[in-house]
Amino acid sequence: MLFLIVTTRSVSAQEEPLCVENSPERRGEIGCSIIENKPLPGNLKQPLFWHIDRFETGERVRAAVVPASIAFEAHGAWWRMSIESQTESHHGGQHVTEVKLLPLPEAHKYSMVVISAYIPSGWTSRVHLHSGVEAFYVVDGEQCLETADRAFKMQKGETLVVPTGVTMRLVATGSKPRRAFAAIVYDASKPPTTRMGMETASQLVSCTK
């Protein structure tokens, strides 16, 4: 089951850069950055939420970091992201959103990968799947996620949660580049992402339909 709010656009396909550490996105250029791959504490209790808070300064947000959170700068702001239970505490920051995660796969240990992307409209990710639950938040622009069941369209400020093991391809849609975050909470004994051949894209519901 997937959770989302939707819109629609047509796109043309061009493959976006791979997500890597310290990509050009970190310098305000086109790219997809792995912000951090962080082991999570073993005492987290489901249901879990992805909490996103915005801060005015790097000093303030770094002071609010705990074992299940990270702090970083992206898209003109400072951000704190955490995986924890539902809470009213935003640690001195401005609350942006919280996203309830779907049940995690059974595992002895979990890790969290946080990704930040700045991608032109019409570009697509590679076809892939994850060994855990993925959540998206659109900072600006629009994006669409193609899966075997349907295509999920998202606008600025919207979120989406995807179960473990769903084959997908992400498409930047709309009239301007997409700026977006993703968090993957996954089985730490496995790679977070498995890429698949682009020929498998034909098995997914197109964002152009």
Residue ranges and their predicted role:
Residues F3, T7-A135, E142-K209:
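Jelly-roll (double-stranded beta-helix
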